[in-house]
């Protein structure tokens, strides 16, 4: 799986990049229409190229909105982003709760206290398979890793039967509080985040 490229980006820069992608998509789609009936046209190739542009645009949007949702509440956006990127590459499952305005501890079964500075290497080690702390949620508050191996409430809503426990827990916690919950699937390595009881994919752009 391609790794997601995170970078801090301003709203104006984000919109500028999206505009460039949209203009490219419109231009490419227009060209496909003009040559649609030509015998030597490789339609599958051109649609594949167009899909790559969409993927890159979705990746930029994923990074920007994730940043905008959490940077007010923790200065460690880049460290968190680096950690889930690495965990995704290795298909190490992870569940990270980023506390925002609502206190979350009354909704969780507390695990092991950490009160450590946020670093990508520490987060990666926590979720390394076999680590006693990996099977649970990591709680982030401001610039601290507060605790690990926390048990979260599962969503009570009907969800896709293919969603695992981590994703159900992310939906549950983000439904009870305004916390943002990051998830990495250990089966696929796919990244996502839950906000307001809804799960959003973190799309990987090409590198």
From Swiss-Prot:
Coiled-coil ranges (or none): 13-37
Pfam families according to UniProt: CdaS_N, DAC
InterPro entries linked: C-di-AMP_synthase (IPR014046), CdaS (IPR034693), CdaS_N (IPR019457), DAC_CdaS-like (IPR053472), DisA (IPR050338), DNA_integrity_DisA_N_sf (IPR036888), DNA_integrity_scan_DisA_N (IPR003390)
GO MF annotation terms: adenylate cyclase activity; ATP binding; diadenylate cyclase activity
Keyword terms, alphabetized: ATP-binding, Coiled coil, Nucleotide-binding, Nucleotidyltransferase, Transferase
Consequence of substituting residue 46 to K: Suppresses a triple DAC mutant, 20-fold increased production of c-di-AMP in E.coli
GO BP terms, alphabetized: cAMP biosynthetic process
Reaction catalysed by this enzyme: 2 ATP = 3',3'-c-di-AMP + 2 diphosphate
Outcome after substituting residue 201 to Q: Suppresses a triple DAC mutant, 12-fold increased production of c-di-AMP in E.coli
Conditions for induction: Expressed under control of the sigma-G factor in the forespore.
Record EC number: 2.7.7.85
Phenotype upon gene inactivation: No effect on antibiotic sensitivity to the beta-lactam antibiotic cefuroxime (CEF), upon overexpression of the c-di-AMP phosphodiesterase GdpP increased sensitivity to CEF. Double disA-cdaA mutants cannot be made, suggesting they are lethal, while double disA-cdaS and cdaA-cdsS mutants are viable. In single deletions of this gene, germination efficiency is decreased.
Signal peptide start and end residues: none
Function: One of 3 paralogous diadenylate cyclases (DAC) in this bacteria, catalyzing the condensation of 2 ATP molecules into cyclic di-AMP (c-di-AMP). Upon expression in E.coli leads to c-di-AMP synthesis. Overexpression of the hyperactive mutant (L44F) in the absence of c-di-AMP phosphodiesterase GdpP leads to growth defects in log phase (long curly cell filaments) that disappear upon sporulation; spore formation is normal, showing sporulation is insensitive to the excess c-di-AMP.
Complex and partners: Forms dimers and probably also hexamers; the dimer may be active while the hexamer may not be active.
NCBIfam families: c-di-AMP_CdaS (NF038328)
Similarity comment: family membership: Belongs to the adenylate cyclase family. DacB/CdaS subfamily.
UniProt protein name: Cyclic di-AMP synthase CdaS
Gene source species: Bacillus subtilis (strain 168)
């Amino acid at each position: 799986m391609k790794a997601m490229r995170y970078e801090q980006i301003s709203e104006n820069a984000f919109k500028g990049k999206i505009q460039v992608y949209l203009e490219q998509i419109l231009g490419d789609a227009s060209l496909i229409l003009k040559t649609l009936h030509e015998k030597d046209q490789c339609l599958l190739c051109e649609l594949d190229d167009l899909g790559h542009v969409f993927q890159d645009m979705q990746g930029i949007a994923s990074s920007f909105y994730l940043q905008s949702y959490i940077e007010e509440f923790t200065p460690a956006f880049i460290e968190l982003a680096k950690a889930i990127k690495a965990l995704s590459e290795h298909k190490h499952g992870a569940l990270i709760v980023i506390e925002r305005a609502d206190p979350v501890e009354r909704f969780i079964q507390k695990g092991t206290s950490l009160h450590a500075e946020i670093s990508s290497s520490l987060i990666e080690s926590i979720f390394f398979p076999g680590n006693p702390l990996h099977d649970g949620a990591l709680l982030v508050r401001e610039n601290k890793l507060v605790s690990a191996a926390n048990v979260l409430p599962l969503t009570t809503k009907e969800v896709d039967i293919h969603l695992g426990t981590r994703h159900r827990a992310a939906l549950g916690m983000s439904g009870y509080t305004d916390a943002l919950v990051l998830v990495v699937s250990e089966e696929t390595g796919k990244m996502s985040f839950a906000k307001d009881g809804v799960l959003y994919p973190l799309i990987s752009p090409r590198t």
